[in-house]
């Protein structure tokens, strides 16, 4: 039996997780390393849908970052720690926007009216943060004279393109880590209810394996949420929340119920 489960791939786990909760009873018998590997796979997919597709599409659309900087970014230069630019710029990259407006000596998120994640450049500073529902969340603000040397312009920025690609990879990995944290947090929340159900059905499941069922049960709802985000919220977020909440409870409940009348996994993975 152990040899049979050792042949289960991450693709097999994904297929079962999204389409066959009745077979979750087999997934809870896998080694912990396989479930961890599955979480990393899902984090990669979620990040690719939410971030990777947008970035790749953007880079292809502009003909590469070098072409973008050379031909599409307004001519700019930094002198005496102050930014001078030919025109205002608003550039969407994935789910983020690079905004430049030198009409503001020191720009703030309050100067921007549209929701989104921003890297905003004023004449003397750069601000990073998010605007959501009229509320601003500032991550950091820095003076330009601490980031760039005098004379920095489009040509110098173009020479730094390789560093931008490295930064994109680092951002991807960071977002993957964030997706893993999100999966763990949601699974912990749902496991509170699922644990009660598992006890009521006399499944013999330990808390760790209930948590594992929740991880698998959340896979499809999280994928759907990411796809909706990629499609610029084709379905309103409030409606999508209700849909995925109902779907998650359904998948998890059926996954817990699949263990009724079966031998509980001999070992807890947590």
Can you annotate each of these PLM segments?
Residues 52-56, 76-81, 246-259:
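Short, highly charged low-complexity linear segments
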Residues 152-264:
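Hydrophobic alpha-helical transmembrane segments and adjacent short intramembrane/lumenal linkers
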Residues 1-10, 262-270:
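Low-complexity, intrinsically disordered extramembrane tails and loops of integral membrane proteins
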Residues 61-64, 91, 165, 255:
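Juxtamembrane/disordered regions of integral membrane proteins
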Residues 33-54, 109-114, 119, 163-180:
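Hydrophobic alpha-helical transmembrane segments
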Residues 2-66:
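Internal alpha-helical transmembrane segments
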Residues 11-18, 196, 200-201, 267-269:
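Juxtamembrane inter-helical linkers in multi-pass membrane proteins
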Residues 63-157:
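Long, solvent-exposed extracytoplasmic domains/loops
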């Amino acid at each position: 039996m152990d040899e049979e489960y050792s042949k289960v791939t991450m693709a097999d786990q994904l297929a079962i997780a999204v389409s066959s909760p009745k077979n979750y009873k087999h997934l809870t018998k896998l080694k912990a390393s396989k479930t961890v590997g599955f979480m990393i796979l899902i984090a990669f997919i979620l990040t690719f849908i939410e971030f990777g597709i947008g970035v790749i599409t953007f880079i292809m659309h502009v003909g590469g970052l070098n072409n973008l900087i050379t031909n599409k970014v307004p001519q700019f230069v930094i002198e005496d720690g102050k930014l001078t630019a030919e025109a205002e710029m608003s550039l969407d990259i994935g789910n983020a926007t690079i905004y430049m407006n030198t009409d503001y000596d020191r720009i703030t998120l309050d100067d921007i009216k549209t929701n989104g994640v921003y890297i905003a450049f004023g004449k003397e500073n750069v601000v990073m943060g998010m605007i959501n529902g009229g509320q601003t969340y500032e991550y950091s603000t820095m003076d330009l004279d601490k980031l760039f040397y005098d004379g920095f312009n489009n040509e110098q920025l173009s020479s730094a393109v390789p560093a931008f690609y490295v930064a994109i990879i680092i951002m991807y990995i960071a977002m993957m880590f964030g997706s893993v944290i999100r999966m763990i947090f949601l699974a912990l929340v749902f496991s509170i209810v699922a644990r009660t159900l598992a006890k009521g059905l006399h499944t013999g499941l330990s808390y760790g394996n209930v948590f594992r069922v929740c991880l698998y049960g959340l896979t499809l709802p999280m994928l759907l949420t990411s796809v909706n985000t990629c499609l610029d919220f084709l379905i309103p977020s409030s409606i999508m929340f209700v849909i995925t909440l109902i779907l998650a409870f359904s998948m998890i409940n059926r996954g817990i119920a699949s263990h009724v009348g079966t031998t509980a996994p001999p070992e807890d993975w947590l």
